[in-house]
């Protein structure tokens, strides 16, 4: 594989694992398109107008089959792109190959080193003939931070960034507060059709998929701790309970904790569950959630995994001096001095993309339709967005939902003029206030 990657780097403007996987990738992309009605609707609506003509987008999102559909949508709307993955394990090599074969600059492969990861990001910021980006599309904030810290000279020409995930949004707000954010940002994560669908329904399916693929373990009857009860944690807890697990929740937020209790989950602390649970899932977007001390208490063959964006929720670094036995890709057993074995999935990185293929295409169509709309907003209406962090307006959020409803057989009721007047809305929407909690 190394020789193939070296050859690719020298002869083409891409860096991937294996170009021979392209045909397989193309077949899966075509299947995914049938499950991504939002993106396909945007292609149809804007194919002639080309609202992204002139846009040069540097992207950093998991290089999956679904992301391939996003990339090709951006290009059909007029954009040029250069792309890397936001996680060293999340790339689907056949997806990367399918795009590279079409001449799209992709810098991603499954199993990158940390050094290679940052080199791939750097490759998206510089292209042939002086190519540099004027828009960013990010997931987790690494591309944004790298641009601000390593390439400040690019910032004056960047109209903005659209950010995909909770962790990246936290970083954006911190940068804004510190004064280090030099261009506007659209917080895609907090669009209702992203956070209440991708984060919840996506994780509800992909967590179980990844644990089963990695371990073949029976979920029914297991005691499982889910750390965090935001939208991601809610989806994880629902799926685990549906499979017959006894689910325990850890939380810092009393509102989320009370929600968990009202759903019938036990709200506990890691300290009290570390020595008795069978499976641990972190879903907080925070650091040091499962510590070395917690793992010392865990029983033999306990399974530890993370579905938050970064790999610092579980203190994997503290285990490096122990013996590691690789079972299969992204599945390791850590053997403690007393002989206890702890099963670690994806080295503490995103388990659903490290050990499986991530969220299903349909729910990613929700998220990525928001991304395309955010890119159009930043490109077409820069005067509306001084430096700051924004969310997409409610009418666009509702439009994303509308584009997906028919695909699942849904039909909307139409308000009469009298009904619309009674509740004070336009018959065509938006139907809720900006502060409404879905």
Swiss-Prot record:
List of residues binding substrate: 64, 139, 164, 194, 198
Main location group: cytoplasm
GO terms under cellular component: cytosol
Cofactor(s) needed: NAD(+)
EC number(s) from the headed UniProt entry: 3.13.2.1
Locations listed in the record: Cytoplasm
Binding site for NAD(+): 165-167, 199, 228-233, 251, 286, 307-309, 352
GO MF annotations, alphabetized: adenosylhomocysteinase activity
Domain of life: Bacteria
Swiss-Prot/TrEMBL catalytic activity: S-adenosyl-L-homocysteine + H2O = L-homocysteine + adenosine
Pfam families, A to Z: AdoHcyase (PF05221), AdoHcyase_NAD (PF00670)
Listed transmembrane segments: none
Keywords on record: Cytoplasm, Hydrolase, NAD, One-carbon metabolism
GO biological process: L-homocysteine biosynthetic process; one-carbon metabolic process; S-adenosylmethionine cycle
SMART domains: AdoHcyase, AdoHcyase_NAD
Pathway: Amino-acid biosynthesis; L-homocysteine biosynthesis; L-homocysteine from S-adenosyl-L-homocysteine: step 1/1
First-tier enzyme category under EC: hydrolase
Protein's UniProt keywords contain Hydrolase: yes
Cofactor note: Binds 1 NAD(+) per subunit.
NCBIfam families: ahcY (TIGR00936), PRK05476.2-3 (NF004005)
Role played: May play a key role in the regulation of the intracellular concentration of adenosylhomocysteine.
PANTHER family: ADENOSYLHOMOCYSTEINASE
Family stated for the protein in its record: Belongs to the adenosylhomocysteinase family.
Protein name (Swiss-Prot/TrEMBL): Adenosylhomocysteinase
Gene it is expressed from: ahcY
